[in-house]
Structures are given as C-alpha cells and as structure tokens.
Amino acid sequence: MNVEPTTAAPQLASPRTGPSARLAGYLLPPYGIYLLWQQRASTLAAAFGTLGLLVYLVLYTGLGIALLKLTGKAEIDWRGYGRPRLVWSTGVRTSAAWQTSNTAIDTNSGAYWTDYRGPQRDGRYDETPIRTDWQQSPPRLLWKADLGGGHASMTIAQGRLFTMEQWAEGEAITAYNAADGKGLWKHLYPARFNDAYGMGGAGPRSTPTWHDGRVYALGAEGHLHCLDAADGRVVWQKNILEEHGTRNLMFGLCASPLVVSNAVIVTAGARAGAGRNTVIAYHKDTGAVLWAAAAENQAYMSPMRVTLAGTEQLLVTGARQLMGLSLTDGKPLWSLGWSVSYDNNIAQPLVVSTNRVFISAGYGKGCALFEIAAKDDPFTANKIWENKHLKNKFASSVLHEGHIYGLDDSGNDDAAHLVCLDASTGEPKWRADNYGHGQLLLASGHLLISCEDGNMALVKATPESHQLVARLPALDGKTWNNPALAGGKLYLRNGRMMACYDIRPDASAGTRGISTAGPEDLQVVLVAFVLMSVMGAALLVAITKLRRSQPSQ
C-alpha cells in the first residue's frame, strides 16, 4: 500500500510583542540600557551601547528642559557670578492679581526711609534701635506678598510702601499698605526692559523717591513720573532719554531720582552725540528743566547729595569717572578716573570723612580711597590708597566706626564674601562667609544682610572678627534687591515677593523658619527627565499594544 509522504506544517514566526532595544533606547534610555544587557550579542557591544545611550541621555533630558521652557514652567535665571541657572517660572504678574488693602493706613508713622538705601543713600539706619538677639529671638514675620519682577528697592513714608515692578501690561509704580502688604494704588504704563543677554531679567531697576507727598520714579527705559503719593495721580511725566537725545545703558536706567530743594535730579544714560546732557535737574513741581549737564556717559549708581571739602555737591559715578558737580547748575567741581569692565560702575560711593570718598567695583577692579581738596579751582582729587581686597559688584558697602564692610565679588565662582577694611589704610581686617551677591545695611552696630539665596543674616559690625549672630530663611528665590528699614521693621523683596519682619527690640519673637528651597536647577533637570520618561514609556506601551494587535503573517 502506498503511503503518501507527509509534510510538516510550516512553523509560523511568533509575533514580536516587545520593543527593540534601539527603539526603547530612543524613547526611554534607562529601559533601553536594561534591554541591551538582556539581549546582548556580546558584553563589549552592550557596553558601547550603554555609553552611547548615556551620552544621548543628555540630549534627551535637554529636550525635556526645552519643553518646560516652551510651556512657561521653567526659565533661565542669572546669578551674580554671571552664570545661568534653571529655575521654576513664577509667571508674569498681571493687574488681575492686585489685592486692595482694607487695613487703615498709619499716616502718623512718619517719613524716614524715603530714598534709595536710606535718607543719605549710604545704607545706614539711625531712626530707632533694632533687636540684635536673633539667635534667641528671631524676627517675627508680619506679612508676605507676591510681587512683580525688577530690581527696585522700597521706600516707606506715612504708612505707605512704594516700589516698582514688571507686570504683563508694562512697568508699574505701586503703593502698598506697609501694615499688611496689600495694594493702595498702582500706575501702569507700557514698558518692558531686559538687557540683550537676559542677564538682569525684565523689569525696572531704580527705586521711587518720596518727597513732600510726591513720588518720583524712573523706569528702565527713561519714563520719569511725578505722582501724588496718596492716590497715584500723575502730576507730570516725561521720557528723559527721548527729551535729551541720549541712549539707554546696556542694563537699563538704574539711578533713583534725587530731590534737592526744588529740583529732582536724574541721570540720563549715555551720550548719543556731542553736547548731549546726561545729568538733568527738573523742577519737582512742574517738570521744567532747571539745568542740564553734559557730563560723561552715566553708569548705574544713584546720584548722592554729599558734603566734601566743605562744599555741598552732587556726587555721581559715570561710566569711567567719579565726579562732583555743583548742585545749583551741574557744573563740574572735580573728577577722577575710575574705569571698570563694561563700564559697570554699580555700587554707591561712600563718604568716609569730611574730605574723603571710598569707591569700589567688581569685575576684578577693587577699591580705592580719594581725598578731595578745595584749595584750588577746580578742586583736586588725590588717591590715598587702592587695592583689590574689596570688589563691590552691585552690593554697596557701609561705614561703621572707621571701618568699611562690604561683599567682595570673588570672580567666576558662586561667591561674594563679607570683608572688613580699615577705611584709613585699606588694610583688610577679616574676610569671612559667602553671602552671595546680596545687599546689606547698617543698623545698631550690626550688618543686616539680604543674601542672594533669599536668607537674611545679622552680623556684628566689628573689626575684631566675623561674628555671625544668625542666618535665617526670609524669601524664596534669587534676591538682588536692596532691603529697606523703617520704624524698626525690615522690608525685603526680590523679583517674586516681598516680606516685612518686625525687628523692634520690644517686639514679640518669631520662629526661626525652615528653608524649603532646594537647588532649583537640579529640580528642573529631574522633572525634565521624568517628563520625557513618562512620555517615552507611554509611547512604548502604545507601540507594544499595536504590535500585539497585528495578525500573524
């Protein structure tokens, strides 16, 4: 009998139910590395594949960071040492976020801190004693409130706090109730300045000046306003750059208006041609020009009313000079050369005696003491000493009992160390902790330091040694703005928020607080990686399900 040969049924290839190592590596690198070692042809191949995926992981996470930036969740922020960092975006403040105060204004509280860095613009507070036992009795937080961007400080008068900030609608001159931090009035106008590199961030830089019931405020693009301090009504306004044909500075106009007698004095950027005026005095009531001086290109410090060599005068720092001008007509009395990289004269000069003035700058420049003599016409300016022991980048120094205290720009590292110098010789007495590129004031023989990381610190002002009393959490985020002090209350702000702490000697103590802020750049990177991983895992699952649903061939 014939038996027909049987043939074996063809064996169907089993469908691929999982992703390839290559695809997994593109979508989810850690899983791709796992598959490489599970499916490896050789250890060497798996090792090379792992190395490639680790390099690719940088690009992978970078794409996640780009997505966070595009969606407005993260942004690039520059620290004082000139390097970018990733931070969470707090968004741009809008007028819809404005909260009106329902608390009575203490109009009898006086008008002491009415200028940038205090009544004399020298960072000294002498109104009342302050509490100095912060270790045992920390300052009590009275209120904290959200705020728009910018580098303005605050002035306080008759129960009102005045500042400037960047809103979505433009620059805003704002008044808050000093009792609760809520709004009283706001004046908005269309303006938004940021430098070409984005290093300074968007927003106004100068601080409003209060004088005799009026507020004088200068925006970063030259908008000068005189407002009624009670209700924000515009008394007069103009753009000083347009009016005088000058050009803006690289980092915007920063100088706070100075009121002397019937004049409000401002600096108007850099000359765009010969004979252009860069220091202007307006009538404080009408805005009419009283005098204008064709001084050199101006820099970022605020003009000061000082007495040197027996003569009251206007002290200004230009791009490459320190100079004294007549208060009556702006004519030069004396000048001396002081050049800094990028023309970045930022820190305030400091009068240390009847005829001596201290000046300092960062970017490797250093500091010097000059003596101004009035024996000749014009005056003479002679150097007493110069060194590099104290380099103020944008944090101005203070003077106490013959010694200068300031934050030294250490260069490219993330540091600004507190330094004490003998004012007469320039000899360093000590160099201590890193407080970052923050700001400081002097009160009751102590240094009040607003640290770059948002902490506040109290240090005894003594040439003997660095004596830290306490360093406590205060604000969230980078803090470059100058603090303000009035009625025994410390006002702090940055580009995100402001806060008020009670530091009167008889005030009840607060809590030390716990800083919850971590390294934001690391947080952003981790979230970017997790975001990409979740998206990659979702795609892998979808691809796997699709392959399993396809019929076998």
Label each PLM-derived region with a short phrase.
Residues V58-L546, P551:
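Noncatalytic, solvent-exposed loop/strand surfaces
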Residues R40-V55:
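Membrane-interfacial entry segments at the cytosolic side of transmembrane helices
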Residues N2-S20:
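Membrane-associated alpha-helix detector
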Residues T17-W37:
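Hydrophobic, aromatic-rich membrane-embedded alpha-helical segments
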Residues L28-Y31, G52-T61, S533:
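Canonical hydrophobic alpha-helical transmembrane segment
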Residues A8-L12, G32-Q38, D506-P519:
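Juxtamembrane low-complexity tails/linkers enriched in Ser/Thr-Pro and polybasic
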Residues W37-A41, T544:
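Structural signal for the C-terminal ends of transmembrane alpha-helices
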Residues V3-A8, R547-Q553:
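Short, charged juxtamembrane terminal tails flanking transmembrane helices
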